[in-house]
Regions:
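Polyanion-binding surface elements
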Residues: 2-21
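Residue-level preference for well-ordered alpha-helical positions
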Residues: 12, 51-52
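Major-groove DNA-recognition helix of helix-turn-helix-type DNA-binding domains
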Residues: 17-51, 57-60
Length: 61
């Protein structure tokens, strides 16, 4: 089972970007989640939200 959250290292590797840029993306995505009323963890991003926002992939129920 995959962890629910991605760390900056995993985001950087997935997108082939630098670690500081990965942190910038995570901050931006976490701000979006905070705006929707979610609690966020600094330096980590929900895997499902990451995939939805970056790839447009939504999990069908």
């Amino acid at each position: 089972m995959e962890p629910k959250f991605l760390r900056a290292e995993e985001v950087a590797q997935e997108l082939s970007v630098s670690k500081p840029y990965a942190y910038k993306l995570i901050r931006q995505l976490n701000e979006e989640l905070k705006g929707k009323g979610f609690i966020t963890i600094s330096g980590r991003i929900n895997r499902e939200y990451f995939n939805e926002r970056l790839y447009g992939a939504r999990k069908e129920n």
